Design a protein with these regions (language model features):
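Conserved phosphate/anionic-ligand binding catalytic regions in large, soluble enzymes, centered on
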Residues: 35-55, 59, 122-123, 226-234
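Short glycine/threonine-rich loop-to-helix capping motif typified by GTGT followed
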Residues: 22-35, 63-73, 98-113, 132-147, ...
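Mobile "lid/hinge" segments at catalytic clefts and subdomain interfaces of large enzymes
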Residues: 47-51, 55-94, 100-110
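Generic long, charged, amphipathic alpha-helical segments
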Residues: 220-221, 227-234, 238-267
Length: 318
């Protein structure tokens, strides 16, 4: 805002800035984490000096907000005012080098984009041509890829999911879990993609719920303590993202004991978790002991992966 006024010496009016918390990073599963997301966004807006803020209720993406969620959304702003006293300071981040550098860099990029749009005929022309939509949608695709590869974390969706949670019963607006947006009538211009970051993960979990059967995934942990814990945690997160039931273990003395425990637990998938050096010994033994009674997975990408594949395929052929 200040940069625009500096560039235009005739600027005589103060811009009115309104901020609204995002829906893009909201999630259906573990929905109360949405409170932390929206509170962080509201605080950022207050620090930036906006004139007004709208905090979205944490349950907005899957149902009509109730009295509780709307009251909490209002109170989130009151916390910033009455307990953090963000209304008492004109510019709370003034003097913070990293905040001001980041702010200036964002403002410079935004100004360049603004000028590019104006040079092409203005915002209306750019929207009708689909240029704005293409740029926004490309950004959405890039961020979704970051979520899919866990370079961007959404707690409860692609990291530390609660696999025991069932969401189908609480979803009132059926389109929300996989979309997050809507339309009325036939579009006459290219549309914006309003889908949220967690939408694909939620669709995967909903498919598991609708199937009526929750696969059990057994962590066969053995050998090197540090490596088996790291790989069992990664594998548990991986399968829990699909809503599969995770059966974790403290470790087994022998592969055979682990396999029998997995079969006794009724596991459909057995994940061997150990170190790269030990996989050459444990993987063939576990695969042989399992004898096709469940799907067999080796956690990680060990250097001996090609040798293991050849050995396991040879065993199948035999």
């Amino acid at each position: 805002q200040r940069q625009m006024c500096i560039r235009d010496s005739n600027c005589a009016c103060k811009m009115n800035a309104h901020a609204q918390t995002s829906e893009w990073n909201m999630t259906v599963y573990d929905a109360h984490v949405n409170l932390l997301r929206s509170q962080t966004e509201a605080m950022s807006a207050a620090l930036a000096g906006v004139d007004s803020i709208t905090v979205r209720p944490f349950d907005k993406i899957y149902q009509t907000p109730d009295d509780f969620s709307e009251r909490i959304a209002r109170n989130q702003q009151l916390l910033l005012k009455e307990e953090c006293h963000l209304d008492k300071v004109v510019d709370p981040s003034a003097g913070s080098y990293y905040v001001e550098v980041l702010t200036n860099s964002l403002a410079d990029v935004a100004w360049k984009l603004f000028l590019e749009v104006e040079e092409k005929g203005g915002f209306s022309v750019a929207v009708n041509a689909g240029e704005i939509q293409n740029a926004v949608n490309a950004s959405n695709v890039a961020r979704k890829k970051a979520v899919a590869t866990r370079r961007e974390i959404l707690l409860g969706s692609n990291q530390y999911p609660n696999f025991t949670e069932v969401a189908a019963d609480k979803i009132q607006e059926k389109g929300s879990c996989c979309c997050g947006g809507g339309h009325c009538g036939e579009a006459t211009i290219p549309a914006l993609d309003f889908s949220r970051g967690a939408s694909e993960f939620e669709a995967l979990r909903m498919a598991t719920e609708k199937s009526g059967k929750t696969p059990k995934v057994f962590m066969l942990t053995i050998g090197n303590l540090a490596m088996r814990l790291a790989r069992s945690q990664f594998s548990a997160n991986f399968f829990a993202c699909a809503g599969y039931k995770i059966i974790d273990n403290l470790g087994f003395d022998t592969v055979e004991a682990g396999v029998e425990a997995a079969v006794k637990a009724g596991a459909e998938i057995v994940v061997l978790c150990s170190s790269d050096d030990e996989y050459a010994e444990f993987a063939p033994a576990a695969y042989k002991a399992l004898a096709g009674r469940a799907e067999f997975v080796v956690a990680g990408a060990p250097a001996c992966a090609d040798d293991l594949n050849c050995l396991l395929y040879t065993s199948d052929a035999a």
